[in-house]
């Protein structure tokens, strides 16, 4: 994603959520028609500035749901600033595990995402 798309209007968290929702609408659908993934609006996502592979990154954690359906679960998202290529690399992971603990699954997603390395 171009740097300007994340950093426009100084509303970084809103821009990241907008990108998540647009990707969810296009690529992540439920088993019935006219359903797609969106970020749940009832709760504000957790948002933190951090570093991954010595690069500025924004961590966003929250809950996703399927629009027009009854599926939901936690997600974790990293937007990693890649100045060399004038872009943000977006990493997004989510889990669906009805009626079961999701904490360990989210920890696994987080560990995989934090291990990203940029090659020269």
Model-derived regions, located:
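Conserved polar/disulfide-associated segments of primarily extracytoplasmic proteins
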Residues: 1-91
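Surface-exposed amphipathic alpha-helical segments
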Residues: 86-120
């Amino acid at each position: 994603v171009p740097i300007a798309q994340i950093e426009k209007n100084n509303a970084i968290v809103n821009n990241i959520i907008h990108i998540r929702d647009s990707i969810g609408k296009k690529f992540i659908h439920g088993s019935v028609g006219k359903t797609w993934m969106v970020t749940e609006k009832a709760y504000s996502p957790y948002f933190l500035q951090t570093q991954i592979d010595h690069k500025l990154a924004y961590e966003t954690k929250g809950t996703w749901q399927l629009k027009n359906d009854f599926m939901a679960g936690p997600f974790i998202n990293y937007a990693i600033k890649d100045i060399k290529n004038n872009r943000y690399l977006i990493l997004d992971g989510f889990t669906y595990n009805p009626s079961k603990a999701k904490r360990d699954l989210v920890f696994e997603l987080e560990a995989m995402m934090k291990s990203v390395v940029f090659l020269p």
